[in-house]
Amino acid sequence: MRTIASVQLDKRRPALILTRRSKLPLLTWLTVAPITSTIRGITSEVAVGPRNGLDHDSVVSCDNITTVRMSAVGDTIGLLFDDQEPALARAISDAFELDLMSE
């Protein structure tokens, strides 16, 4: 499972913490994907909602992955569950046009 937390970006908004949990205590910066209620229906989005601790249906925007200072991260809002991890991997792959099939 991955944490969804309140993060100071363009404004305070929910974001999915992408940095691996085991390294968080060692880092000053971490990588996040912002969560937005603007749903475009594109392959670089991951659907999230009340099940994940959010107030309404939203998406993880993998086109807008960014790095923030640890101090920008606030309270935990919810979680991205293990069964959503494949969708996250596909969305990140699509956002960066990674060809994972050629290995």
Positions of PLM-derived features:
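Loop/turn positions that initiate beta-strands
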Residues: 1-4, 62
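Compact nucleic-acid interaction/catalytic patches
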Residues: 6, 10-50
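C-terminal terminal-subdomain/extension
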Residues: 52-103
